[in-house]
A protein has these predicted regions:
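Metalloprotease/metallohydrolase-associated module, dominated by Zn2+-dependent proteases
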Residues: 2-71, 91-136
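Short, small/polar residue-rich loop motifs at catalytic or cofactor-binding pockets
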Residues: 74
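Active-site recognition of the HExxH zinc-binding catalytic motif
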Residues: 78-90
């Protein structure tokens, strides 16, 4: 059976994070960083907090509560933007809208080279995404 779109998205992000790691942040730093992003994006700031989760779950975006639960007390910037993307997107899956928004956020709040590399990982995995030039 072929991997699902979600599995391919996660695999692409994992491969990207191995090649171009993003910073790990304390919970206080994560909350401050996402507050800055939320202000720039014109949305309320989500609360980031540590929570017990299964070993195969790194984090969860809880849309109704507008918060992000993380398993580890030092999440990466990519993990935080992944979950922030879930909060910002209308579709709560890992489809084209999600990947396009994630690359846009990485571009604006981490770096252009990181965004280009993540975009390439998605394309190399045959995942659809809006053209990179329109993500910036």
């Amino acid at each position: 059976m072929a991997p699902s779109e979600t599995q391919l998205t996660y695999a692409s992000e994992d491969a990207f994070e191995l090649e171009m790691p993003t910073r790990t942040l304390s919970l206080d730093e994560a909350n401050d960083w996402l507050a800055m992003i939320a202000e720039a994006e014109g949305v309320d700031s989500p609360l980031v907090f540590k929570s017990s989760m299964s070993n195969n779950t790194e984090a969860l975006a809880l849309s109704k509560e507008w918060c992000i639960a993380v398993r580890k007390s030092k999440p990466t910037q990519l993990l935080l933007l992944h979950e922030m993307t879930h909060l910002l997107c209308v579709n709560k899956n890992h489809g084209t809208e999600f990947r396009t928004e994630l690359v846009r956020l990485v571009r604006h709040y981490i770096s252009f080279p990181h965004a280009a590399a993540l975009h390439k990982k998605f394309i190399d995995s045959k995942l659809t995404i809006t053209l990179f030039a329109t993500c910036i």
